[in-house]
Amino acid sequence: MSEPLVAERRLAVVGAGPRGVMLLERILARLEGAAPDAHPRRLRIDVVDPYPPGPGRVWRTDQSELYLMNTPAFFPTACAADNPGLRPSTAAQTFDQWRRVHPEASLGVRRRQYPARAVYG
């Protein structure tokens, strides 16, 4: 017996910086949580960015530490916060959790201070 045809879906993510990576993480978390009996679908994801995946242009790690984020350290995150309506994150920590574990890497920034963009990258 032949296998049923599986429809392929395509998705283009423009930007492989923190937002693009966060979007990919949420898609993967959703797919991991899909019911096993759900119709199998193939998903092709194309990521488009002139820079390598990771910090992107804005969050480059080689820029001056004088360039600050426009939000305090407790606000930005690369993973979904605990929220009953969301699937658990596949990422390990929020930025705030990370900076508490790695004070030397986060330049000792405190919860309500504005970290350098390079630190977030």
Regions found by a protein language model. Give the residues of each.
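N-terminal Rossmann-like FAD-binding beta1-loop-alpha1 element of flavoenzymes
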Residues: 5-46
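Glycine-rich active-site loop/strand segments that organize a redox cofactor
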Residues: 48-121
